[in-house]
């Protein structure tokens, strides 16, 4: 009787111990505190932490979040609005951060090209460290998810590289995402190419998954250039971008004339006609 009772107690102790240990480890991920996100659709102010100049009129601006352990909370492929009062009038401009929530805790970064007659871009260029900007978001109809397409073709011009770079980085940093990416990136001159070292590093690390064609409007006399010259043509798109299919998507971002031309060529190649306002599932999406 005592033996049976002792065996029963031992069995109960082992069972309870197993349940406790199993619950502790299997629930470890669930018990981790949720990541703090910052964006909430309301206007918020963020201070400029650093400014990294890339060209004579382009820089990466890093803004701090109110909490050092928080992230911006922006879905990949979406953008934020920046507000500023210029000559007594409120102006708005949308930008896609180049940073990802997965690797930017306590801050976010914007790639901005400033124009002499620009509004928000000029305001950003004149910011001093510690100055604040007003931001609201998330905004946009695109939200990238891993493996949503087998292939993604991208056409970008100038700072239109921002959403493409964000998506490429997200794919590159996720070993489970097997999406193949082909990017055609156009600029006026060689010095205007933005984020080239970062882009080239990802291509070098995963050449079978990422391919980039750089295009320029012109090169200086005697300057070496291994890319293409001129405008993005039907032949360029046919050769360097995925063919239209249900498993492929074409993303566009850049100067309006370039985007309009790419939309027309895409139709001639067999892609669906781009809609006036692009949605996530469109075969051709213009940011």
Curated annotation (Swiss-Prot):
It catalyses: 2 Fe(III)-[cytochrome b5] + NADH = 2 Fe(II)-[cytochrome b5] + NAD(+) + H(+); 2 Fe(3+)-[Dph3] + NADH = 2 Fe(2+)-[Dph3] + NAD(+) + H(+). GO terms for biological process: protein histidyl modification to diphthamide; tRNA wobble base 5-methoxycarbonylmethyl-2-thiouridinylation. InterPro entries: CBR-like, Cbr1-like_FAD-bd_dom, FAD-bd_FR_type, Flavoprot_Pyr_Nucl_cyt_Rdtase, FNR_nucleotide-bd, OxRdtase_FAD/NAD-bd, Riboflavin_synthase-like_b-brl. Keywords: FAD, Flavoprotein, Membrane, Mitochondrion, Mitochondrion outer membrane, NAD, Oxidoreductase, Transferase, Transmembrane, Transmembrane helix. GO terms for molecular function: 2-(3-amino-3-carboxypropyl)histidine synthase activity; cytochrome-b5 reductase activity, acting on NAD(P)H; NADH dehydrogenase activity. FAD binds at residues 125-142, 151-183. GO terms for cellular component: mitochondrial outer membrane; plasma membrane. It is found in: Mitochondrion outer membrane. Residues 41-145 form the FAD-binding FR-type domain. It is a single-pass membrane protein. Its EC number is 1.6.2.2. The chain crosses the membrane at residues 5-25. Its cofactor is FAD. CDD domains: cyt_b5_reduct_like. Pathway: Protein modification; peptidyl-diphthamide biosynthesis. Belongs to the flavoprotein pyridine nucleotide cytochrome reductase family. Monomer. Component of the 2-(3-amino-3-carboxypropyl)histidine synthase complex composed of DPH1, DPH2, DPH3 and a NADH-dependent reductase, predominantly CBR1. NADH-dependent reductase for DPH3 and cytochrome b5. Required for the first step of diphthamide biosynthesis, a post-translational modification of histidine which occurs in elongation factor 2. DPH1 and DPH2 transfer a 3-amino-3-carboxypropyl (ACP) group from S-adenosyl-L-methionine (SAM) to a histidine residue, the reaction is assisted by a reduction system comprising DPH3 and a NADH-dependent reductase, predominantly CBR1. By reducing DPH3, also involved in the formation of the tRNA wobble base modification mcm5s 2U (5-methoxycarbonylmethyl-2-thiouridine), mediated by the elongator complex. This is NADH-cytochrome b5 reductase 1.
